[in-house]
Each structure stands twice: as structure tokens, then as C-alpha cells.
């Protein structure tokens, strides 16, 4: 609903206010399509909104957005302060909520999974509607993991394909062919990693899959620094992306060379 914040200054002091992105008069079209998303043992309904975007030569692209009907903008007070634990009301309020405390960091995990799960379900639904065979998903869809925020789409898509009768090994192959990853930082220490405890609490259905992916990655390299789950029980999202996508690049050619030659050289 809101961007990071609307910035203003008064008497030399910064003031932070909500920055509305979606309003009652926006072009986002509410649909009847909802997808179930399980978070911390509770099932939420992610509603699909469609936003038409003018495309090349007068054609139209569609931006698919997801929201919860229970979101309540009135819980925001004193600038951009809100209860970060009230997931029903806050989950899609702010883009990248403040993660300076544990509640904010967990909220980011909630947000990321809501979007990738609903998005993956939409992709598979559209695939089925067009007569696409799930085994050939990579011929139908391309999923670009833009920075590490959507990384959970890898285990989630494997999970969804498993529900549709596809064995783990083939699901991994399908997802790897379907997904590509763009890395946005040249500092290895800045790459997103989550304490396993967060994922155990918020998305326990993904952890068995992430464990299997980690075990598979370890058969490819003995370098512990390239593992998905490290010795401190942190899950490295970028490592999972690199191991289980078909392509990794930086945001520019020079950026890609830096990643290859230094920060991510072990993978190259």
C-alpha cells in the first residue's frame, strides 16, 4: 500500500509519513481470484489485483499484484509506526518494512513468502489454463529472481510441483531451468541470509525442501562457504539462488565481472 515513506523537513528535522502507492482511485483491478498461502500455520488468502501497463506499439502488459482483504491502513500512527506483529492487518502495508528489530525482520519473511507463493500459484494456474505440461514449465515461463527478496520461489515452486505429482529431483531440474537470478550487491556480507529459526517459524513447509537443496548443493562442492545452510544455522538466499537457477548476473557487465572475480568467485 505504501512505499518506504514520504519525506518532508521542518525546522531542519526529517519527518516520515506514509507514501501511498495504491489508492481507491488507482487502476488496479480487484479480481475474484485468491490463492491460499500458509504462514506460521495459518492460511491467508492472497487476492489477485491486475494493473494494466501500456506496452510497446500500443499493446498492454499486465502487472499482477497481491493483497489481503484484512489489511488496515488505520493502524499506522505517529508517522509510519505500526504494530509489526499484527500480520492480518500489516502484511502488505509497507514496502520493505523497517528491519531494525526482530519483528520487522520476521515481517519481511512473511511478506516475501506471501508474494512468491501467490505468484508461483498464479504461474502454474496460467500454465494449466493454456494446456502447458508442468514438466515443460521452462518452455512456458521465465522467473527472474531480482535480488534475493523473491528467493523463496525456488523451494516454493518445488513444493507446488510436488503437490502436482512431480518427484523432487525433476522438480529441482524444472525450477532450475525456469529461474534466473540477478545479484544486486558486490559485498558478500550484505547478501540476504535468514536465521533458520525465522523460516522454521514462518514457513516450516519450506525447511525440509531447503535442507534437501542444501544437501544437494554440498554434493557439488566441498567448500563450506558456498553452502545454503551454514554452521550458524543461517539460510543464505543468494547461495540457494546461484545453485538452483540456470543463470546469475550482476546489474551491469562490470558488476558481473566483480562477482565472478572476487565476491562470488567460489561459485564461478
Give the positions of each predicted feature:
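A conserved ligand/cofactor-binding region detector
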Residues: 1-268
Amino acid at each position: 500500500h505504501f512505499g518506504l515513506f514520504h519525506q518532508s523537513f521542518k525546522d531542519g528535522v526529517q519527518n516520515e509519513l506514509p507514501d501511498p502507492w495504491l489508492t481507491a482511485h488507482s487502476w488496479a483491478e480487484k479480481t475474484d481470484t485468491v490463492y491460499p498461502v500458509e504462514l506460521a500455520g495459518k492460511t491467508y488468502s492472497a487476492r489477485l489485483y491486475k494493473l494494466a501497463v501500456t506496452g510497446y506499439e500500443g499493446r498492454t502488459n499486465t502487472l499482477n499484484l497481491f493483497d489481503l482483504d484484512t489489511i488496515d491502513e488505520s493502524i499506522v500512527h505517529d508517522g509510519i509506526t505500526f504494530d509489526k506483529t499484527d500480520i492480518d492487518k500489516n502484511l502488505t502495508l509497507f514496502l520493505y518494512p523497517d528491519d531494525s528489530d526482530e519483528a520487522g525482520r520476521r515481517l519481511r519473511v512473511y511478506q516475501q513468502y506471501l508474494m512468491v507463493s501467490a505468484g508461483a500459484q498464479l504461474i502454474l494456474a496460467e500454465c494449466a489454463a493454456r494446456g502447458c505440461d508442468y514438466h515443460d514449465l521452462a518452455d512456458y515461463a521465465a522467473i527472474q529472481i531480482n535480488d534475493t527478496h523473491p528467493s523463496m520461489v525456488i523451494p516454493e515452486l518445488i513444493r507446488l510441483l510436488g503437490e502436482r505429482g512431480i518427484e523432487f529431483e525433476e522438480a529441482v531440474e524444472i525450477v532450475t531451468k525456469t529461474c534466473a537470478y540477478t545479484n544486486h550487491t558486490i559485498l558478500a556480507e550484505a547478501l540476504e541470509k535468514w536465521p533458520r529459526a525465522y523460516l522454521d517459524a514462518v514457513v516450516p513447509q519450506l525447511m525440509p525442501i531447503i535442507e534437501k537443496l542444501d544437501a544437494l548443493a554440498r554434493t557439488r562442492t566441498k567448500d563450506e562457504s558456498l553452502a545454503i545452510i551454514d554452521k550458524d544455522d543461517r539460510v543464505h538466499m543468494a547461495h540457494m539462488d546461484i545453485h538452483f537457477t540456470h543463470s546469475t548476473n550482476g546489474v551491469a557487465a562490470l558488476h558481473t565481472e566483480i562477482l565472478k572475480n572476487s565476491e562470488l568467485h567460489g561459485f564461478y
